[in-house]
């Protein structure tokens, strides 16, 4: 039987989007924790709660045209789109070029995690993912690894070097992907995952 869980940073997390209800009870989940040799399992209850909690998912469920953003954000998106080409790419592009990008970005993080070997990195790219490339002067400098499931898109892994922040690469990437998934494909929402506790990031601010 295919498992609904996967290992992630020493824990178990659900494979499906946060709006889907976990069917296993706590006894069954505890058994999976023991079998998987992890410390804990993480799952979501009461998704889209009106009350503020200490843990949240970052989602966007409304398409925004360029004119909907503030003047400052519009300018940053425009600059990003002028500086970078954002497009869907086959997995072979990331398999060939992604590891160097991953290594460079990882070293910029103040992270408690260890860098993956190339073999483990390539293994993490397997599955039913969509990949977006961020190209600067025709060179791949970043990417997003996305999973579509249950009418939602999870931006599961995004790697762009901080040296491109002043050229607004992430603004161009998020604007392009949000338009594609929310406007063109009409998905329920896109998500950048849970609130990050492993490294600092301002990417989530763009989605809220």
Question: For each predicted feature, which ranges?
Answer:
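A conserved beta-strand-loop-helix scaffold within acyl/acetyltransferase catalytic domains
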Residues: 1-10, 41-50, 59-166, 181
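Acidic-and-aromatic substrate-binding clefts and catalytic sites of carbohydrate-active enzymes
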Residues: 21-22, 94, 194-200
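Short amphipathic alpha-helical segments and helix-helix/interface helices
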Residues: 27-33, 74-77, 118-123, 178, ...
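Conserved GNAT acetyl-CoA-binding A-motif
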Residues: 37-44, 182-195
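Conserved active-site alpha-helix within GNAT-family acetyltransferase domains
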Residues: 50-53, 197-208
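Conserved acetyl-CoA-binding loop-helix of GNAT-fold acetyltransferases
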Residues: 166-180
């Amino acid at each position: 039987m295919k498992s609904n869980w996967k290992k992630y940073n020493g824990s178990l997390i659900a494979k499906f989007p946060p709006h889907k209800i976990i069917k296993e009870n706590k006894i069954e989940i505890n058994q999976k924790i023991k079998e998987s040799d992890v410390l804990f399992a993480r799952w979501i209850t009461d998704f889209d709660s009106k009350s503020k909690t200490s843990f949240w998912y970052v989602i966007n469920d409304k398409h925004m045209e360029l004119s909907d953003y503030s003047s400052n954000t519009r300018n940053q998106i425009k600059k990003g789109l002028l500086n970078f080409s954002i497009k869907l790419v086959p997995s072979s592009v990331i398999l060939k070029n992604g590891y160097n990008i991953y290594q460079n970005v990882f070293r910029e993080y103040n992270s408690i995690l260890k860098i993956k070997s190339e073999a483990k990195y390539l293994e993490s790219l397997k599955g039913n993912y969509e990949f977006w490339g961020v190209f600067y002067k025709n060179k791949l400098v970043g990417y997003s690894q996305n999973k579509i499931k249950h009418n939602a898109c999870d931006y599961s892994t995004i790697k762009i070097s901080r040296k491109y922040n002043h050229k607004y690469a992430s603004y161009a990437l998020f604007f392009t992907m949000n338009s594609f998934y929310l406007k063109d494909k009409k998905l329920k929402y896109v998500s950048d995952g849970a609130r990050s506790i492993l490294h600092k990031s301002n990417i989530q601010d763009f989605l809220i």
